[in-house]
Regions:
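Paired acidic/hydrophobic, glycine-rich loop segments that form the ligand-binding mouth/hinge
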Residues: 126-131
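Short helix-loop capping/hinge motifs at secondary-structure junctions, enriched
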Residues: 15-25, 43, 74-75, 101-102, ...
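Glycine-centered hinge/linker elements that transmit conformational signals in sensory
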Residues: 36-41, 79-110, 155
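A structural signal for short loop-to-beta-strand junctions that line the ligand-binding cleft
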Residues: 1-16, 47, 152-157, 161-165
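Short helix-initiation/N-cap motifs at beta->coil->alpha
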Residues: 28-35, 107-122
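Extracytoplasmic/periplasmic solute-binding protein
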Residues: 1-3, 8, 32-82, 125
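C-terminal lobe and pocket-closing loops
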Residues: 133-147, 158-215
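Short, solvent-exposed loop/beta-turn-alpha elements that line the ligand-binding surface or hinge
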Residues: 26, 53-56, 71-91, 140-145, ...
Length: 215
């Protein structure tokens, strides 16, 4: 039973965008993102953009796949021939490296979700493109110094709108050989029910409800 789902999106400092005189579109392009990053980049106080740079499939490659997609690239062609040396891949990687080199924080190659979350909550990131779950943390005044200055937009586009954001899902299952199958099944049913969702929302707020089930 699915209990959690997320996508990716743009999270940005609306106060900095307003100060720069830039209105962020609901569906921005990567050209828009680069222009805004240049305007609000003010190190060491604020870095124009923060992106995952730590190597790994669940790290920078999760993000890079969406960037390559929007440049019109793909991992394989229809004959399963790798496309890593194609022009869209080269364009996307060059854009990514230049963006972080010019407008990202120092040490970006070691940053993944948790490192960037800490930077964002300290007010060090002007923009961040990452998992939608981050909204729960960066809008929480108990965790974030800029909770009241955050705005959101869809994943940036470039040559195409296809694949501009990712989609992940997690699910609960009961193993066939479990000794307490009935109890486990009842728990899974409850933990994925509207009753559970409303209970969490009432107890601790909608921001703590599993993503993909929020109002």
């Amino acid at each position: 039973a699915p209990f959690y789902g997320e996508s990716s999106m743009l999270m940005y400092r609306k106060d900095l965008a307003d100060k720069a005189g830039i209105t962020v579109a609901d569906k921005p392009t990567w050209t828009d993102i680069k222009a805004l990053a240049a305007k609000i980049h003010n190190p060491p106080n604020v870095y124009g953009i923060c992106l995952r740079g730590k190597p790994g499939w669940g790290d920078n490659m999760a993000f890079l796949s969406t960037l390559v997609n929007t440049h019109g690239g793909q991992w394989f062609d229809m004959s399963w021939k790798p496309q890593l040396e194609s022009k869209p891949w080269k364009d996307a990687i060059t854009f990514y490296v230049d963006l972080l080199k010019n407008y990202g924080p120092p040490g970006s190659s070691a940053n993944s979700f948790n490192e960037i979350l800490a930077l964002y909550n300290e007010g060090k990131c002007g923009m961040w493109i990452d998992a939608t779950i981050a909204a729960s943390f960066i809008t929480d005044p108990k965790q974030s110094k800029v909770a009241d200055k955050v705005a959101f937009a869809q994943g940036p586009q470039m040559a195409t709108t296809k694949g501009a954001n990712w989609l992940w899902a997690w699910a609960l299952a009961v193993p066939a050989g479990t000794k307490n199958a009935d109890a486990a099944q009842k728990f899974v049913t409850w933990a994925t029910s509207k009753e559970y969702i409303n209970l969490i929302a009432k107890s601790t707020g909608w921001a703590t409800v599993p993503t993909g089930t929020r109002k």
